[in-house]
Swiss-Prot record:
This is Matrix metalloproteinase-25. Hemopexin repeats lie at residues 368-417, 421-466, 467-515, 516-562. PROSITE patterns: HEMOPEXIN_2, ZINC_PROTEASE. May activate progelatinase A. The gene is Mmp25.
Amino acid sequence: MCFPGSQISPARLYYLVSAPWICTGSLTSSRLPRRRESGPLRVPPRSVQAERILRLPAFGLPLLALLLVPLLPVRAQNPDAKVVSMGVEWLTRYGYLPPADPVHAQMQSLEKLQDAIKVMQRFAGLPETGQMDPMTIKTMRKPRCSLPDVLGAAGLVRRRRRYSLSGSVWKKRTLTWSIRSFSQKSQLSPQIVRTLLSYALAVWATESGLTFQEVNSQYQEPDIIIHFARAYHQDSYPFDGSGGTLAHAFFPGEHPISGDTHFDDEETWTFGSTDDNGIDLFAVAVHEFGHALGLGHSSAPNSIMRPFYQGPVGDPATYRLPQDDRDGLQQLYGRVSQNPNARPTRKPLVPPPQPPAMPPDSPATPVPDRCEGNFDAVANIRGEIFLFKGPWFWRLQPSGQLVSPRPAGLHRFWEGLPTHVKVIQAAYARPLDGRIILFSGPQFWVFQERQLEGAARPLVEFGLPPGEDVDAVFSWPHNGKTYLIRGQKYWRYDEVAARPDPGYPRALSLWDGAPFAPDDVTISNTGDTYFFKGTHFWRFAEGSVKAESDSPQPIGPKWLDCPAPNSDPRVTSPPKTTSKTRSCDCHCELNQASEQLSPLLLPLLPLVAGEVFSY
């Protein structure tokens, strides 16, 4: 008999486990005294097909912590009891150890505990020592995904493949998504967040043929709901503040929470940061959307599905899934056709990497110099600035950097745009549903991301006279209305009611300092309004209809990484309009705009009525 007596105190057990003469057998001896219990601790079942966080009961920590003591390196200083307990709880939470119970806890042999540590070290890319050494403990403290790494006992067996599958997939190929709430802490604007999340979904769409469509959750229940939350947020994975668990997502299924993806709002979410102060949102989003599609964690060194945060992964426009993740995804949803002429049902928001060699430009359509300005259209599309000129366009990332100094081809990017369309005169992203509208002549085309939807439609739908075309179009977030400018006049369109507003056109001179017949107008990610004409731009602060005193300024140095002019350019300013009484006009416009404003801002309207007027 290895353990005399019928009851053993924790102190006595520590003494017995530590003694070298205690027993030559294993700890699985049936002679180990058992304490009477009503039954093992039961975790309430969940109908959601997602991994569960298995928390180690308090009574199981001392025993398993003591069992791990012999696994510590002999020459290293043993960590204290709190660190060992943390390690055991960590291994249990992330699936490497089963939950302890008072009846079967003694079945945990040292060999099985060593195996669990080795699997953890394999996932982390550490030497598989089977010991809770300092590097292992340090890795356990790294920021990571909330979900377990091992899905059942089979996950402990070394596989030829590194990826793991949850066993659940979406039964449809078009998935809808929506953002329930944005981060309250991050300096990233909602528009940039939406763009990064769209790109993260597009990464998976490229390799699977799946289609992701953003919808308004007020009108349609999305498959994937994205939520920035803190601490407990009504699921089984409460967040732990900055630096611990970063995010989690639920596997596909029929439950309302299936596919939902949550980010810890106490993290400092960044994008394109060159320092270590923050967590790259795009990298984490790609990882979590892998879970939302049915992938588990992977131990492959380069996999985006490794459980630990690995830092930024690069430009969303060029990022592609590593091979291990592609293999796992295609096990679930099949392979994308390898025929280069075959088109998947949905293209990503960004094109795949361009071929290394491109045909020379035709003399009829030479590549223009971006620093010359005179753009045909400028638009903010999901946080990126598109600048159109002839059959070309440039793109600026949300960080303000050029995607490439070389422009992209118009028809190569916008699939389905008629070949006879050589110039885009105006463009904007419709805020109601994210559709992208391109204008040329008296017509416009509607795109779902890059794919054309339907035939050309006439501009008369926006309230313009038949045969009229536009100089500029933009949606103003101050009141949610869409503005269409032609020459010295502008029209206004109500997107919600889907009709032109009465009382238009009006004089563009109401926008004090704006140039007549601008090349285009767009809204920045910070909410400022920018008029573009020729080689210069005019800035209007958020919510203002008066140009800033430093306007106009050259476009090139500010937007396109062009050298600053040697001297201040001589710009012919638009004719200044004399100040005139606008009390009635202001009153009418404010009454209309107030329907779109937050109730918290309504008491401030009398204070600013002298500055905000009808336009």
